[in-house]
Amino acid sequence: MSAFARRNPPGIIWIEATIVAEIHIKHLGGFMIKLKKLSAIALAAVMAASALTGCGSKKNKSTVTTTPTDLSDEQTTTVDTSKETSSDAKDDSNSEKSFGLTQKTADGTILQCFSWSFNTIKDSLEDIALAGYSTIQTSPVNACYNGGDAGIDLNGSGKWYYHYQPTDWTIGNYQLGTKEEFKSMCEEADKYGIKVIVDVVPNHTTKSTEALGEGLLNAVGGIDNLYHKKGKDEVSNYKDRGECTHQAVGGLFDVNTENIAFQNYFINYMNECIACGADGFRFDTAKHIGLPDDPVEDSSMPNTFWTNVLSKLDNKDNLFIYGEVLQDGGDRIADYIDTLGAATASSYGYTIRGALQTGNLDVRNLTNYGIGNAKPNIVTWVESHDNYTGDDATYSKITNEDIVLGWTVLAAQKTGTPLFFSRPYNASSDLIWGTFNKIGMSGDYLYKNSAITAANRFRNAMAGEEQNIFNPSDSTSVIFIERGKKGLAIVNASIKPYEFNVETNLADGEYKDRVSGNTYTVKDGKISGTIENKSTIILYNDGYLEFAPAAIVKVDDSVTGSYNTDSIEVKLHVENATEGEYSVDGASPVAYKDNDTITIGAGKNSQETTTLKLTAVNEAGNKTAMTYIFRKQATLTGSIEVTFVKPDSWGDKVYAYVYDETTKAPTVIENAAWPGVEMEHVEGNKYKYTFEKNWEGYEPLIIFNDSNNQSNAAMEPGENVINGKEYTCN
């Protein structure tokens, strides 16, 4: 789920900070909903400024509270991190290949395979295991809204958030793959000891009710029984538990989850997922489904969803289950943790990102998980897909370097189960959807970066060890995270190197940094050395497993996923392998060397795709694979005309804003300043726009609006321009 807002005109980026725990208007596939922006003084107002760097001194071993005022000595804390989550054990030592992964999801790390297809995940499992992830999380596997002409753009012709617009609770959809492919993926994951979490969405459906499945409607007794009485009315007060659990979020209709017939239908869906190989679930919008003592709409229908659903899941004791509970003061997070077993710690995500942006890793902030006295059974993150795609716009504020630092802080701790959001392939602060913008492809290679991998493997080796976290006396830009007497992770968020000389629980001896390969010595209970600016150190010997570097296959970074010529030349790369292989549209593989160039896509019609699959094997026989999806975009020449059908709620003046801000344009090219050119009224709610500007050689996008409402969501690109197409807000 994500936040909605009007798209910023190209070239303008919001830089205000926010300290609210949740933006309530959610981007769930509806069109534009106006946000009341809650601006705040930057997070520097919440945290102290980064302290000086220099040589460390003796570490104070005493435990401190989470909000002390005394900054005179080193801050250290030992946190009680006892967990009560489900066992969900899957031992990779019994798998065909062992990668040192944890038996329990809670003890390891989770890779969120954001919009990856089932086949892509299956092809990537060996890379995922080598990178140290014990669990993967899929996007929703349910039948979903088929919009954007069934396109597979993350945003454009098709949208990622259609995953979160269920039309039925059956396995398989046009974006991610079939039920058979899902089952095959789960079976392959078993071979590596990797657990599979499925993102499930019981709270709401698409607002396009004509798309709902007949099986669903028959099961619940017709559409009138599917929704709450006010299920189509938007929530206005998120602290009102009646509104929060009975009304629509982001324009999507709120399911009557108290309906026993619906519960049974949904239980069957979840058990089908389990039968296919699912090892756990993330409940999307969990706080919008009532707890037993929340207000009820009908006294004959008590809040039994959680009790009934969770008690009737097959293999329940071995499942890892958590709920998305975005915190706002009325979220009841402690009760959701008690009910489901674990929940997201969204407020802690804000804390982590604030620390990264200010360079202040104050232990007192980073050991305050924002959950009060609740059990620390939390899923933590540097960013979620909501933070990335929504109003937080972390894609433009949090760099890959920041993510490495933040991820190490999360993965090194015992508290929480870290979830790594896999950004779109080759994404950047200028390209939120990356250079390919395709559903189905794997994400940016950062997820298997060497420092990320080192942090994951450290966490796996430290399972069960208690944590001791402290800052040296002269800097809160550096944080030390000890795990028992076994390992130590150090993170420096400063722009300067830091020399340290501190006491440690590690036994005397030499320890190799699993990131750089440098060696550090512990002598007489103290460790000294230098950590470079904006970097991490991972030290441990016991439990370390050596693996050959994974092969890397990729296209050149200059290559993008669309082309407007007859064909496209693609330069190929391969590392940590003598050669790679490529296959085009499923043809027989052909060997290639690093820097070879091939030509693909010839003869394709506009909007048709070409699939390029690259594979290679490293020296240890570990296979890596990457699939790219290219789309031919016809050159726009001559007269171009499009039509748009506006929603009833819009004003009578409708505009077309056409622009190109890709790297092919030196500056933003547009048909007019925002809101664009007024469209010509045809009839009813239909309007047309005839292009006057010559867009040959460019890849324009279009946004329809009435100057208050618009056809796309916050900070997301418009749709591709296709001559003769009729557009809608769906």
What are these regions (language model features)?
Residues E546-L636:
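Low-complexity, disordered linker/stalk regions enriched in Pro/Thr/Ser/Gly
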Residues A51-T69:
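Sec-dependent signal peptide cleavage junction
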Residues I537, E608-L612, G697-I702:
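Exposed beta-strand face motif in extracellular beta-rich ectodomains
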Residues D91-N94, K104-G108, C144-E187, G221-D254:
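Aromatic- and acidic-residue-enriched carbohydrate-binding clefts of CAZyme catalytic domains
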Residues K414, I495, T504-G509, H573-E579, ...:
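Short proline/glycine-enriched turn/loop motifs at strand-loop junctions of beta-rich domains
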Residues A89-D107, D123-A129, P140, Y145-Y164, ...:
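Active-site-proximal helices and loops of the catalytic beta/alpha 8
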Residues A3, G11-F31:
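Short, Lys/Arg-enriched N-terminal segments with co-localized hydrophobic residues
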Residues P589-N595, P647-E696, S707-P717:
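Aromatic-rich carbohydrate-binding modules that target alpha-glucans
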